[in-house]
Each structure stands twice: as C-alpha cells, then as structure tokens.
Amino acid sequence: MASNQPTKAIHVIPSDSINIPEPGSYTSGTNTGTGTTLTDAGATFLDGQTNTGGTGYFNRVAAGDVVYEPSTKTAANVVSVDSNTKLTLSAPGLTGGAAYNIYRGVGGLNNRKSGNEGFSLFVGTGGDIKVLPASSENPVILKNISNNSYVPLQVVRVFNTDTTASDILALD
C-alpha cells in the first residue's frame, strides 16, 4: 500500500549556502583537523568500503556531500577529497576532536539533483523560518510558525539568516 507519509528524517542545521542533505549519514568519525580541513586517521574517504560480496565499493565521499558536526551544529560542503583521511571543506568551523557525520548532498541553489522534490519540515520550537522552496530560486520567510508545527511547503534549504525557529526536522 502506497503512503505519502515521510519515512526518513534529518535534523536541520540552518545554512545560508548549504541545502538540506539526504537523511541517513553514510559515514562518521572524529575530526582531528582544523579550519577547512577535516582529518580522520581511521577514514577511507577515497576508497570507501568493500561491499559484502567483495565485488565493489560503496560509501565513497564525493565533492558536494555535506558534513554535519552535531555538537556545534555546524555544516559544511565537501569541496575536495584529498586523500583517504583528509577532506577540504567549504567553510571553517568544524573543530578538532569533535564527532562528524557525512551525508549525500542534494546540490546547490542552481545545481539540484534531478527529481529532488525537497523536504517537509517539522518545527519543534516556533519562530520565523527563511526557506528556499523546492521549485524556486527565491527564498521566502514563513512568519510566526508555532511550536510543534508542520510546514506545508516542500523546501531544499533552511537559511540561518532570518530564521528564529529551532529544533527543525526535514522529513522525506
């Protein structure tokens, strides 16, 4: 039986330049780098992981993927995969010694993946939300969203600027 109910969710880290990534991190670890460099001695960013049948690889990190650092609520895009243990990120802010999660990116403002319909939002703590609707290049501000509300608009980004609501989930 088909359902139009969401089956996946991700906590939203508002960003003026990074779209909401696909829910479900595919790799994680601890960053020992600083600035725009993410370093993890135990990572396999280039090689990924061997599938169970030994016939190929999966979970290779790619430019455009999104790194979340949950403890500081920081997000950055992967600019380049420099080695198995080192990534260059779009912005500084991820701290050494902090845990990170990497998610598949869904493209920038004018570079969205084909077929990306965006996400519904659930707002835990109310306020204003500046969003980029899924089929638009112009952001809009949704005013006075109340606590524990669903936003009836498919969006690809929640902006940090002009957003006062918090505890936001993107539902897919």
Predicted regions and their residues:
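Surface-exposed, low-hydrophobicity beta-strand/loop segments enriched in small/polar/acidic residues
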Residues: 1-25, 60, 66, 77-80, ...
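Small/polar beta-strand repeat architecture
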Residues: 26-59, 68-107
